Amino acid sequence: MKFVSVEQAIKDLQAGKMLVMVDAEDRENEGDLIFPAQFSTQEKVNFMIKEARGVVCVALDETLAKKFELPLMVPKNTSNHETAFTITVDAKDATTGVSAYERNMTIQIFADDNAKASDFVRPGHINPLIAKKGGVLERTGHTEGTVDLCKLAGLKGACVICEIVKDNGDMARREDLEIFCQKHDLNMIAVSDLIEYRLKHESLIKLEEKSQSVLAGFKAEKFIFSDHNQTQHIAFCFKDIKKCENVKFHISGSDFELLTSDKFSKLLEQIKFLSENGGVIVFMQGEKSSTTQYKNYGIGAQILRYFGIEEIKLLSQSCDKDYIGLEGFGLNLKACNFN
């Protein structure tokens, strides 16, 4: 079974149909049953609970999350993929909030222009999720993918999503998802196709400055980029970048932490390697989590695309965990190692 185009997926959502969205094989490799919150019905919610069997959530853009005063569930997110769960909610007029009827009642509030935060009680039985502002170009998750797709369809930035679980309780994978879609006459879309679609029409980065520079004693060309959050990221290029495949991503954290660990000497080794063999090191501004290896390199991937890089050899020893969904950005990961 083939994935449908983004254009077809948009038409399906506009018609109020349900879809299955699949993320990357190197991420969760799972599928979510989705539909726009504004087209929610008791029947759809019941189908989701009965057939998909996962946790019913509502993916929201930041604007709606702020409107409904939904704080994150925990101040420090230590989950594998850093999904931005907020506190749970129920409709104020619900009783237990568990039934498909009352969950639908809760979901419809998210799509109501006149609704307000006080229309919810907390905690509840619907799990709101906050999508990153940059969508799939910032984070390659179901949360961002579903909100992006709703917005591309001209709908509100609120989408009902639920993981698809098999009869035996295991998570449904690609082959299982194809069977599920055929059984229920549903189309399936890939997050990677959505990334590719958005990249053809927009970008989250802008080149602010370009100059000759020196990094750790080695001559390099310096590029300063700003993203959609006005955060700056810096790339240092060695030799002819278009002919190079060697890439290093570095999350800029505490200078003190770097200088007092063995990471500093390793970083210097990598910079020396790049200066001798050619390549690029991208310093990404952001908080580096010590509790999870998962990072979202959407911005970094766009910087590489700016340089025309398509095939990369990453200077890293943990590609299986750290670099998720790069293929959606048109990047072919050829190798990943640095001893």
Swiss-Prot record:
Annotated catalysed reactions: D-ribulose 5-phosphate = (2S)-2-hydroxy-3-oxobutyl phosphate + formate + H(+)
Cofactor: binding details: Binds 2 divalent metal cations per subunit. Magnesium or manganese.
GO function terms (MF aspect): 3,4-dihydroxy-2-butanone-4-phosphate synthase activity; GTP cyclohydrolase II activity; magnesium ion binding; manganese ion binding
Pathway annotation from the record: Cofactor biosynthesis; riboflavin biosynthesis; 2-hydroxy-3-oxobutyl phosphate from D-ribulose 5-phosphate: step 1/1
Binding site for D-ribulose 5-phosphate: 27-28, 32, 139-143, 163
Pfam families per UniProt: DHBP_synthase, GTP_cyclohydro2
Domain of life: Bacteria
Residues annotated to bind Mg(2+) 1: 28
Cystines in this chain: none
Binding of Mg(2+) 2, residues: 28, 142
SUPFAM superfamilies per UniProt: RibA-like, YrdC/RibB
Region (DHBP synthase): 1-206
Enzyme Commission (EC) number: 4.1.99.12
GO biological process: riboflavin biosynthetic process
Required cofactor names: Mg(2+); Mn(2+)
Region GTP cyclohydrolase II-like: start-end pairs: 207-339
Sites annotated Essential for catalytic activity: 125, 163
Gene Ontology cellular component terms for the protein in this record: cytosol
Role summary: Catalyzes the conversion of D-ribulose 5-phosphate to formate and 3,4-dihydroxy-2-butanone 4-phosphate.
Family that this chain belongs to: In the N-terminal section; belongs to the DHBP synthase family.
Protein name according to UniProt: 3,4-dihydroxy-2-butanone 4-phosphate synthase
Biological source species: Campylobacter jejuni subsp. jejuni serotype O:2 (strain ATCC 700819 / NCTC 11168)
Upper taxonomic lineage: Bacteria, Pseudomonadati, Campylobacterota, Epsilonproteobacteria, Campylobacterales
Gene (name only): ribB
